[in-house]
Amino acid sequence: MNKQFYSQQWKGVLTGFRPLTMVSPRFSMFLVPRRISCRFVHSTPKKDHTTLLSNDKLATFNVMSLKALKNECRTRGLKISGRKGELVDRILAFETSGSLSGGAAKQAARQLHISKSIRARNDIKPVDDVRMPDIAATEKSLETPEQEYIVHITPLSSSADKKPVTRLEKELSVEEVSANVPPAVSTTDHDKVIFQVDAPTDNIEVVDEEAELDADKRASENFGLHATKEELNSRDKTFLFGFAAALVGWWSLKFWDNKGKKRSLT
C-alpha cells in the first residue's frame, strides 16, 4: 500500500499533475506546479503602463494639451507626429528606458576613468589624479620666435677666441665697438682737433623775431600799394575810354548835322 502510494506521488511530481489520492502534508510542496511568468515589452497593452512611473506623473502627461506633449517629445528627441495617446506612450516609454538604463550608464561612465594598467590587474579602483597638459604654455612657445644661441667652444689659441666667426658674433662685436667710441672733443690747439665721423651734425638756426615781424609788415605794405596802383590804373583806363567814346559820339553827331544842312540847302 505504501509503495503504491509513493509511486503515484512520484509520478504526479514528474508529470506535473496532482494525483487524486490523499497526500500527506510533507509531500504537498512537491505537488504544487511552479508557474514562471515572463512579461515582454511588446506584450503589455498600451493602456496598462508600467508601474515604474508615479501616478502623478502619468496624470500630468494625460492632462497636457497636444501642443505641450509635442514640446515634451521635441525636448526628448522623440517623434512629434501622431495622436495624444501615442505621444503620451512615447514619453512614458522614453522615461522608462531612461530609468532602466541609468545604472548601466553610471557603470559605463565609471569604466571610462579606469586606466589600462588597472584594467589589466582587474582592479576597479579609479584614478586619483589626472594631469592635463598646459595648452597655453605650448601655444606661447610656438608663437615666440626662435632665438639664436652662441655655442662657445674653447679654441686652441687666445687670438682665435677673440675673433668673431658667426654672423651674430660679428653683429655683437660691431655694436660693442660703436658703443666704445669716445665722443668728439674740441681743444684750443687748432692743429690737433678730434673729429667723430659718425657723429650727427645738427644745424641750429638763430631766429630773430623782430626782423621777421618787420619783414612781414613790409611785405603787407608793398602788397597794399601794389593793389591800390592796380585799382587806380583800372579807373584811369575806364575814364579815358569813356571820354574818348563821348568825343567820338559828339563829332559824329556834328558831322551828320552839317551833312543834313547841306542837303537841305541844295
Curated annotation (Swiss-Prot):
List the subcellular locations. Mitochondrion membrane
Record-annotated membrane-spanning stretches: 238-256
Q: From the UniProt record, list the coiled-coil ranges.
A: none
Mode of membrane association = Single-pass membrane protein
- Presence of the UniProt keyword DNA-binding in the record: no
- Give the range of the organelle targeting sequence: 1-40
The chain positions of domain SAP read 61-95
GO CC terms: mitochondrial membrane
Instruction: State where it is primarily located.
Output: mitochondrion
Q: Which InterPro entries match?
A: SAP_dom, SAP_dom_sf
Per the record, the similarity remark reads: Belongs to the AIM34 family.
Record-given protein name: Altered inheritance of mitochondria protein 34, mitochondrial
